[in-house]
């Protein structure tokens, strides 16, 4: 009786762990991170969340604290990817699931890199490259997971949502880079910081 009951007891425990990883890493974690950089921007003298990038908070007063929070946030995103992989075993086929999860993990690792290598002049190139990798991998994850989910009738709405998120993210990324690039028509408005925050919330939603 005990041998027959053991396997059945392991799966619910594993599913519960996966749900906690998904909840903390993909639910609580994004909200906490948005609140953290919003509060950090409000309390820093002379900082404008409308004009300046979120990365600017990782340099200067309390910069190390914000960088630590950013790294923790990225690690929890990787934890979410693990939980997602476990929970989607009966929904996505192995190919779609592992390709999507791999992209989510790459996104998390890239954001760990942006937290360790800040926007300071000495490390800004690494920071910028890691940011691009994070954006591309997230858009890739949206696309792959969306294509996998639309193949399942019960999950088709979520798949469509994910594919729409890919297009919205691409549009926001293009507008944000346009806003931060000197000489463009949008540059004088100095709304790059605001657009980056819109992009951040959209990607975490």
Per-region residue spans from a language model:
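Internal transmembrane alpha-helix with an interfacial aromatic "cap," most often the third helix
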Residues: 71-98, 102, 143-153
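Membrane-proximal helix-loop-helix units in multi-pass membrane proteins
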Residues: 109-151
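Small-polar-interrupted transmembrane alpha-helices in polytopic inner-membrane proteins
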Residues: 99-115, 167-175
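Terminal transmembrane helical module of multi-pass membrane proteins
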Residues: 150-205
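Interfacial segments of alpha-helical transmembrane regions
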Residues: 19-26, 92-105, 154-165
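Interfacial helix-start motif at the membrane-water boundary
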Residues: 56-75
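Alpha-helical transmembrane segments of multi-pass membrane proteins
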Residues: 30-48
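Short, Lys/Arg-rich, polar N-terminal cytosolic tail immediately upstream
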Residues: 1-18
